[in-house]
Amino acid sequence: MCSMWLMASWLMAFVAGSTLADYCGDHKVPFGMEVHKNGNVNILCSRPSCHEKKYAECPERATSTTCSTNSSWVGGVTQHSDGSLRLMCCEYDLLPTYSTIQYEKLTIRTGEYFEGDEQMEGDVVTAFDLIGNIEQVKEPDGKYSYNLLIYRYHCGNIPDTPPAWYMKKQWPYWEK
């Protein structure tokens, strides 16, 4: 009887502390977000052809409540069992240079989604949208809505060399 109670307690602790996570990694960008009817959040990731050789610096976990710098985007989300959302803020030094704000406060609610645009000239991607920040707002009915900051990234004359911090993480690395 005691072992059954322990197993039930362990199961309750596991379920109560569960989280849902979704991430793009350091080679992809978040171009969309979906809020399911049950409140679960997913981000949609892509690697546009004009961004194939570009890298962002992302932390190991989503622990931030906001991605507040103009050189960061949301590289992942963790949704806790209480509904709270944590963000993985990836830093990309060239973001302020090559992007403009497309939408400052685009709101999506339960059952809705946002999917960014890709601008094309023939077969070449010239610009794409990405999520720079997600602000979680608790509505009066207890559900959450999300305000998105959307950047339009203009591929233009982007340098093909990875940033210096990325090169230092590659093995072997020697100072010149």
Swiss-Prot record:
One function term, GO molecular function aspect: signaling receptor binding
Keyword Secreted set for record: yes
Coiled coil: none
Phenotypic effect of disruption: Worms either die at embryonic or larval stages (43%), or exhibit variable abnormal morphology.
The organism's place on the tree of life at top rank: Eukaryota
Cell compartments where the protein resides: Secreted
Glycan-linked positions: 70
Distribution of this protein across tissues and organs: Expressed in seam cells, excretory cell, reproductive system, pharynx, pharyngeal-intestinal valve cells, neurons and neuronal support cells.
Gene Ontology biological process: cell communication
UniProt key word Metal-binding: no
GO CC, any one term: extracellular region
Role description: Intercellular signal essential for a variety of patterning events during development.
Protein name per its UniProtKB record: Warthog protein 5
Species of the source: Caenorhabditis elegans
